[in-house]
């Protein structure tokens, strides 16, 4: 085995950008073992990934011991030990980087060296539509009647698609609000998004799509972890999770700067309206399983409110719709897919 020239240690928390949960301390190498020491400010599931020579980070490593895995309790000097370094493929490389992060079950994917994250949403049933008392202010007829919806498991983007990811796939940036690659892409129509999704699927081998309206609302509500909030993750403190008319300054903001909802999803309310796959139609009181919306229509659904929306426009049940060939500076989207299996054809 060639002598290790450098081992880089990267300790971050990818489960939340608004508050660090993992803090860096130190690492030591002795023989064939590596020991990482880190701090954790709250109980969490922890995993470790490795990147070889500046490449992509691997799926979580197995065979580790110490403060790793499920339900790690907080502490200032927690340790993780890898006893069999030579068994890591590529360990004889000149440079290794280790990533210690909150294990939120995310699928970490790349276009070139640009990472993006797809979050698992466990299937389940929920009540779709406006759950405010009937007749309450800012309740609209298109949000009722409420109805039971049952969904299979799926994945959804942790963030709105960024300008960096769009540019990596499409080679250009159509957005009005620029200056930071982490800004969500906007000024994209529903039809534009279909072209992007087809190209991204071809590049990565994964079958991406837009979420259905029901999938979007279930995820915004927090899925099976929902606490029954009116807005993503909150009941009244809209500013904690949503960029809207009173805190946005009249423009979009980089993704992931506010708090996430119960599923670890960011900006499900506010920032940009998000395209869904469905044509617009009125609700029915009938229970549905994996609804796809009507086969034809005039307008496509948008969800979540935007930076110019009032607070009630960012609720988990607020609906919007528009012609599929229009893209404005407050229209964006996030990705969805059925499974983590790649298309090998």
Language-model-derived ranges and their functions:
Residues 17-21:
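Boundary at the C-terminal end of the N-terminal hydrophobic targeting segment
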Residues 36-40, 82:
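Aromatic/hydrophobic beta-strand junction motif of beta-rich domains
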Residues 49-51:
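Conserved Ser/Thr-centered positions that define the repeating blades of beta-propeller domains
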Residues 127, 132-133, 179, 184-318, ...:
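Functional-site microenvironments in short loops/helix caps that host divalent-cation chemistry
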Residues 103-214, 299, 320-345:
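Extended beta-strand/loop cores of jelly-roll/beta-sandwich
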Residues 40-45, 161:
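Short proline/glycine-enriched turn/loop motifs at strand-loop junctions of beta-rich domains
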Residues 4-14:
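Sec-dependent N-terminal signal peptides
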């Amino acid at each position: 085995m060639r002598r290790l020239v450098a081992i880089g240690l990267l300790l971050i928390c990818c489960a939340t950008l608004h508050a660090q949960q993992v803090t860096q301390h130190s690492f030591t190498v002795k023989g064939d073992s590596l020991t990482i020491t880190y701090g954790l400010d709250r109980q969490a599931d922890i995993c470790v990934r490795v990147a070889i020579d500046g490449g992509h980070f691997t799926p979580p490593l197995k065979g580790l011991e110490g403060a790793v895995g499920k339900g790690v309790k907080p502490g200032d000097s927690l340790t993780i030990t890898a006893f069999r370094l030579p068994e890591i493929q590529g360990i004889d490389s000149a440079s290794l980087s280790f990533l210690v992060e909150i294990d939120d079950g995310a699928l970490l994917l790349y276009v070139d060296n640009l990472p993006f994250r797809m979050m698992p949403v466990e299937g389940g049933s929920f009540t779709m539509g406006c759950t405010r008392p009937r007749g309450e202010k800012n309740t609209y007829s298109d949000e009722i009647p409420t109805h039971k919806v049952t969904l299979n498991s799926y994945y959804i983007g942790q963030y709105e698609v960024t300008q960096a990811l769009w540019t990596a796939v499409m080679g250009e940036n159509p957005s009005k609000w620029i200056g930071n690659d982490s800004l969500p892409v906007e000024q994209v129509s529903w039809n534009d998004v279909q072209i992007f999704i087809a190209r991204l699927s071809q590049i990565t081998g994964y079958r991406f799509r837009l979420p259905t309206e029901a999938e979007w609302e279930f995820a915004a509500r927090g899925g099976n972890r929902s606490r029954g909030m009116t807005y993503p993750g909150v009941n009244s403190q809209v500013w904690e999770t949503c960029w809207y008319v009173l805190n946005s300054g009249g423009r979009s903001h980089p993704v992931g700067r506010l708090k996430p909802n119960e599923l670890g999803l960011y900006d499900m309310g506010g920032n940009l309206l998000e395209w869904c796959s469905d044509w617009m139609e009125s609700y029915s009181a009938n229970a549905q399983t994996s609804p796809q919306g009507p086969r034809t229509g005039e307008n496509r659904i948008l969800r979540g409110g935007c930076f110019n929306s009032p607070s009630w426009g960012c609720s988990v049940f607020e609906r919007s719709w528009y012609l599929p060939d229009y893209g404005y500076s407050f229209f964006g989207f996030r990705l969805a897919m059925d499974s983590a299996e790649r298309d090998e054809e």
